[in-house]
């Protein structure tokens, strides 16, 4: 929407200090636009959208985090994420990963779902690794019938509670 983008710090202590806005939503809420007005073609109106979502690295080694997990999963690649805006409920399809058993990566896994709630999952992060990872830029944000390319990145992190494959 012609507004220069700026850093929008998403989550600090599990609260959004600044929400992504386009010109219209910023005016409605009486705040400054953040440069998040995006559209997939000139035929569509800009709407507030994600651009690049990233989680800062922590100070632990990935191997140290894995070694502290008795039973869990390590997700290497996921896709087809969906989020219910407002409630924050999400689901992601795991393309590849591993079981974690007694602190070690064991059996390969694939074709399972991870289901959770965004704010709760953020609150349940107990460890964050120092290994920055950025995706290859193949994500798409779908909203109001539009699709826009987005990117994301994060280090390895331990989320203590999520639903996996429909079971707790």
Where are these regions (language model features)?
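N-terminal small-residue-enriched
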Residues: 4-168
């Amino acid at each position: 929407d012609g507004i220069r983008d700026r850093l929008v710090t998403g989550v600090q202590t599990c609260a959004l200090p600044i929400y992504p806005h386009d010109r219209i939503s910023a005016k409605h809420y009486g705040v400054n636009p953040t440069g998040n007005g995006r559209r997939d073609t000139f035929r569509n109106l800009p709407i507030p959208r994600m651009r690049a979502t990233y989680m800062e690295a922590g100070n632990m080694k990935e191997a140290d985090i894995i070694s502290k997990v008795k039973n869990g999963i390590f997700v290497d690649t996921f896709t087809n994420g969906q989020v219910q805006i407002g409630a924050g409920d999400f689901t992601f399809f795991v393309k590849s990963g591993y079981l974690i058993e007694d602190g070690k990566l064991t059996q390969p896994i694939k074709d399972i779902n991870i289901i959770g709630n965004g704010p709760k999952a953020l609150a349940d992060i107990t460890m964050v690794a120092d290994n920055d990872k950025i995706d290859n830029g193949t994500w798409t944000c779908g909203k109001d019938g539009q699709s826009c390319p987005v990117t994301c990145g994060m280090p390895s992190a331990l989320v203590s509670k999520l639903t996996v494959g429909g079971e707790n």
